[in-house]
């Protein structure tokens, strides 16, 4: 441990806590997530935020781009969630993200946002798949990028589970890219956009 500390590595949780950020610049203050950190699991606001993006995914929507498994044509409640996804995309224009986690609780800290984040990531992926199936590659591109950006909101969190959820959200949204690629639907310009986005992701650095 001393050897690695001499090289600059940190082993205490205080050294990896993300710095405070201005509220108006903080994605975590989005109306979709802020109620989760009132830490009142019995309140209607907490429950609504927790379940906001929860959908039951039918077996026909199971897929895995790593195994070469495509999705069937997507039919879901797009109209119901479209306005929420639009607002969420707008919230992601804020330059920072720091959830009000009780870091003083160490590795026992409650992370109520992770399930909601993953569910929202799934919705961006489903929306992009629906757009792609209709030939709307521009819309599919934007939804996919939004899903990836959502996952990257977790990049500074020092918890292993946060990084696993981050990776899961990225994987979910890589699916539409892969499907469009094997179907030769993306333009050269769109592929360049994807390449630049993928190159900006550093899972080891956080």
Q: Which residues fall in each region the model found?
A:
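Aromatic-rich surface patch/π-platform used for binding flat ligands and interfaces
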Residues: 1-206
């Amino acid at each position: 441990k001393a050897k690695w500390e001499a090289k600059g590595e940190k082993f205490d949780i205080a050294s990896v806590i993300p710095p405070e950020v201005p509220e108006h610049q903080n994605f975590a203050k989005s109306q979709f997530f802020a109620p989760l950190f009132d830490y009142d699991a019995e309140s209607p606001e907490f429950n609504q935020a927790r379940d906001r993006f929860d959908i039951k995914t039918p077996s026909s929507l199971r897929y895995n781009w790593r195994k070469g498994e495509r999705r069937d044509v997507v039919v879901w409640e797009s109209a119901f969630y479209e306005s929420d996804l639009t607002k969420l995309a707008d919230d992601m224009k804020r330059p920072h993200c720091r959830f009000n986690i009780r870091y003083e609780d160490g590795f026992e800290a409650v992370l109520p946002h992770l399930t909601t984040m993953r569910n929202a990531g799934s919705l961006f992926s489903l929306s992009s798949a629906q757009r792609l199936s209709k030939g709307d590659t521009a819309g599919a591109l934007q939804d996919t990028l939004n899903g990836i950006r959502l996952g990257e909101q977790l990049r500074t969190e020092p918890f292993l589970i946060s990084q696993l959820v981050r990776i899961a959200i990225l994987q979910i949204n890589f699916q539409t890219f892969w499907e469009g690629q094997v179907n030769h639907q993306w333009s050269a310009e769109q592929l360049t956009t994807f390449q630049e986005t993928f190159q900006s992701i550093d899972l080891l650095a956080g």
